[in-house]
Amino acid sequence: MQSAFDALEKDTVSPNTSSPSERAFPSILINTAGYVSLSDMEITPPEETMKHLTTNIFGPMLCSQAFARLYFSASKAAESSTSPPPPGRIVSISSQAAHAALHQHGAYCASKAGLIGLTRSMASEWGPKGITSNSVSPTVAWTALGQKAWGETSVREAFLKNIPTGKFALPEEVADSVVFLCQVCAF
């Protein structure tokens, strides 16, 4: 089962779990929604901080809750089956900004650190029930979002000096980490 939806719209991430046996067993959720807007902390409008928190924490929380409800419902329905349900996997994309202080990144750093806290709580609560929860914290990935934040040449070159490899991550490099965490051997 594969789907895309607006992570901030509760109604779009609350699937009907009345008959899970009619659908494929849910096994993987990747929380990829992200938002960044750079500004000095003393002038960051409260609305910008809320947009960071809403997109980077609340959205993944809504999606993860919906996934867990669907997984647990399908798992219960599969109890009478001879084969055990596949393990559930939740992988959230955080950021190295959750681990390091970055200029003009106050709201972003806080939101990505919060996502790691959420992920740890999900791992603690849902791990014993069959769902692992992990986060990946890449450096800047050269996506549309990364280009928006770091597209200016002088800013980009200054930041690259602080990255040991001297380059931003490619989306496929981040994806490789996510794929590994979704494999059975990562349980």
Q: Where are the language model's segments positioned?
A:
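C-terminal substrate-recognition "lid" of short-chain dehydrogenase/reductases
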Residues: 167-187
